[in-house]
């Protein structure tokens, strides 16, 4: 699975709309996301994981915590991820449950959690549970497995490099090819760098 584009709206520390185009990073398939503490690195992982599985990348963040506390109340909270898998392109859009202003009158109302998966062929999958099942069937893994094989969390890079065959060395080529790595630097610039 290769991420192509990630769009976040009122998600985590991002009050507005933030778009990351992974295609600008090349086709090596290994991306390094760097930035200062609090710049939003983990939020990128959370957004990808939430789009795919309806859960943040870390077990301590509930979907209700994903709405930006800095967002305007009228800005919708959602994540859209376009990715390529087995040569086909998929787009998934998902929003957590959150409070938003009522359409009529004063006060707030609950925005229900929603998910839509656009398939390369055929009708879209439109209910969160059905999208979850479709993603699991497509990728063959759940969120926990995805977090272990597709994303190396902050602080876990060295432990992945030092794994032995006995402990399950899954990332054997990562430490040996640093020149093939591209990165997103999070923060004020938010531009891809090589």
How should each PLM-predicted stretch be described?
Residues 32-36, 50, 116, 126, ...:
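Extended, Lys/Glu-rich alpha-helical coiled-coil stalks
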Residues 1-133, 137-139, 143-145:
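Extreme N-terminal "head/tail" segments of very large remodeling/mechanoenzyme assemblies
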């Amino acid at each position: 699975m290769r991420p192509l584009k990630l769009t976040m709206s009122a998600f985590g520390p991002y009050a507005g709309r933030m778009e990351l185009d992974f295609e600008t990073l090349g086709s090596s398939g290994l991306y390094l996301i760097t930035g200062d503490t609090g710049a939003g690195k983990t939020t990128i992982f959370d957004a990808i994981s939430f789009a795919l599985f309806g859960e943040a990348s870390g077990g301590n963040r509930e979907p209700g915590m994903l709405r930006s506390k800095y967002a305007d109340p009228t800005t919708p909270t959602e994540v859209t991820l376009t990715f390529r898998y087995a040569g086909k392109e998929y787009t998934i859009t998902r929003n957590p449950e959150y409070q938003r202003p009522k359409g009529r009158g004063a006060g707030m109302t609950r925005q229900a959690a929603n998910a839509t998966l656009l398939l390369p062929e055929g009708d879209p999958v439109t209910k969160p549970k059905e999208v979850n099942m479709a993603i699991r069937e497509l990728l063959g893994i759940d969120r926990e497995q995805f977090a272990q094989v597709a994303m190396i969390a902050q602080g876990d890079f060295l432990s992945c490099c030092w794994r032995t065959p006995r402990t399950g060395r899954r990332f054997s080529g990562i430490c040996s090819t640093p020149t093939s790595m591209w990165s997103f630097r999070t923060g004020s610039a938010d531009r891809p760098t090589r």
